[in-house]
Amino acid sequence: MLSPDTVADIRAALAPHLARDLKGRNDFEGEKTNRVYALMAKSPVFADLAIHPLALAFAEAELGPSCLLSALLAINLHPGETVQPWHFDDNGAKVPRPRPALGISAFWAIDDTTEQNGATEIIPGSHLWDGDIIQGAVTPSDFAHKGADHGDGDRADAIKLVMPSGSLAITKGTLWHRGGANRSDRPRLIITPQYCVGWVRQLENMALAVPAEVASQLPERARELIGYSIHPPFMGHVDGRHPRKLLREHAPRKLQA
């Protein structure tokens, strides 16, 4: 899906951010994991990932043409990282299950992801499950503490997303999954754009994460995805006006329509 040159460009754009070596703050983020958030504001190469035709086609088919980019982040698992708690990505809206997905997640493999280096684990068919909590699922304490062992959540029905560098996997937001344990001697890097229906609040506050002067230089579809758009009939307006009109007024010389 991604050429070696594109993968190299992504690595180069991420390098200064990964060099800071900021590790996760809790069990969910991962004590031995780098997470780089707000990628849309950091390099045009990440906007290109968010609007990649195949990923976007899945998002629009599942979520509608007014879908939004909920988050865009890099996840870099270091050797020794343990398994993440089980979770599903569109849980933030707290709409009871079973239900249609309110989001989808794309997983771009920048490194080869293998059974040994922390390939994402998924439970096939779990997007159809009801609201029962499974063994090893994320709990509120996972966002406040480090050091928990979620190995008791291992399941015979789970599979690992083994993917060569440059490949793409897409899952519904209702699918139970978790980051795997990295038992190798090298980090494992992926980038995950997450999309949501146009009426659900985004995980990342894109209005603050992507300054207007940066948004004005993005491709038009990327601007729409971060919120310079309208969910019918008028959700997302600014003082009764389409947000793209205000962006043109605030950055008229930079806007690339």
Give names to the regions the model predicted.
Residues 96-115, 162-165, 170, 194-197:
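Short, conserved beta-strand element in jelly-roll/cupin
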Residues 1-97:
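Non-heme Fe(II)-dependent double-stranded beta-helix
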